[in-house]
Amino acid sequence: MLKIKLEKTTFENAKAECSLVFITNKDFDHVWVKNKKLLETFKYEGEGAFLDQENKILYVGVKEDDVHLLRESACLAVRTLKKLAFKSVKVGVYTCDTHAKDNALLENLKALFLGLKLGLYEYDTFKPNKKESVLKEVIVALELHKHCEKTCANSLEKSAKEALKYAEIMTESLNIVRDLVNTPPMIGTPVYMAEVAQKVAKENHLEIHVHDEKFLEEKKMNAFLAVNKASLAVNPPRLIHLVYKPKKAKKKIALVGKGLTYDCGGLSLKPADYMVTMKADKGGGSAVIGLLNALAKLGVEAEVHGIIGATENMIGPAAYKPDDILISKEGKSIEVRNTDAEGRLVLADCLSYAQDLSPDVIVDFATLTGACVVGLGEFTSAIMGHNEELKNLFETSGLESGELLAKLPFNRHLKKLIESKIADVCNISSSRYGGAITAGLFLNEFIRDEFKDKWLHIDIAGPAYVEKEWDVNSFGASGAGVRACTAFVEELLKKA
């Protein structure tokens, strides 16, 4: 764990084995840049990292005056430093003008600290020869790199303490999600997922209810049960319900997550290459667990319910089949034409369960469609729903948090593609196009009229698990949805 220590001193007077200097917007003339000639000799142009070994200074470029690039560069700095022999590093306080607003200083500090904290993460549980990082401490000298505008009116020390608290909570929450999503399916079963949720509940004094297949049968959650049929004897399903109840709650929010601990496609079997990484199909449910940890520790004034449908989707003699017709908890019949469109079946029943709680807002998270990745790329999540104001709020607050999001629109023509001749709805579209939206429209079939304007669907299929380093994310799971939804909840409560 990397410790960040705040010190009321100048950057020059702070003591550490190494100095970290960000070159913002190719500004090589700043007083903290000690050897401009050396940088020119090696043609360092303010991008990537460069180590001045003699002066023990690591220079890291921030391409533009942008808080998100500052976060990314801070992460790159720690990734570079963990390969070196320094135990401690010092850094000043940087502010970027792009997002200069009333809380500009706070947002810049959050970005700096979160980038630093996330830089050490690596999923190495199964590596026998782990390389422990020597880097243990970052000394933050509470001196501004440049003059801060009047929008940075709060005291530097107060803002730094608040930002550090946020970064520590968010790092812990993201890493809970990352570890869970990265866990291989031989370990990361529905029961294991429930155990992780129980640990989070115990630490945060949350209510938790873990329900088995008997409960699902009682509640007539037949769509959920169908997906688990092939795994029932070995890895039975779990409906996990976490509850955070503060003394004062302005809103009741339900967060619903798809928790497919492994998805081979069922009888509509995936090609072998497509099965690899399907441990990540629990990304939505894992995000909900991480969110409960974050929101509870931040002490948000909302009653938050986290609902996770955890199951496998496998093959076997008992597996559900194409041509089956399922009767969901909501009472609607579903024609199954593809067993690999299973996440939406689990979510349909979980969303029905969530609506029974009468929440003010419902947000579901799922690695739902490959079509979303094709349309938006692997770094961007999709937002769907009916309420434009709610969608816009999630998008703007999510983007400010550093996640990439884009809205996808429902339309009546795509809705026709999930019609069935023999049931209320079909679980797969009759067209190969618009698959991310038709999946969202399928879920819409299970949202009651009174909740249509209270519901958002977030497809995190792209960024939940990426097989390379990007932004502040290491190879594998990213914790997609956690930062965005935390920011969304905070903004939602400001309007309450």
Swiss-Prot record:
Keywords: Aminopeptidase, Cytoplasm, Hydrolase, Manganese, Metal-binding, Protease
Cellular component per GO, a single term: cytoplasm
Enzyme class: hydrolase
Subcellular compartments: Cytoplasm
Binding site for Mn(2+) 1: 263, 340, 342
Entry EC number(s): 3.4.11.1, 3.4.11.10
Keyword Hydrolase part of the UniProt annotation: yes
Protein name, per record: Cytosol aminopeptidase
Record organism: Helicobacter pylori (strain J99 / ATCC 700824) (Campylobacter pylori J99)
Gene: pepA
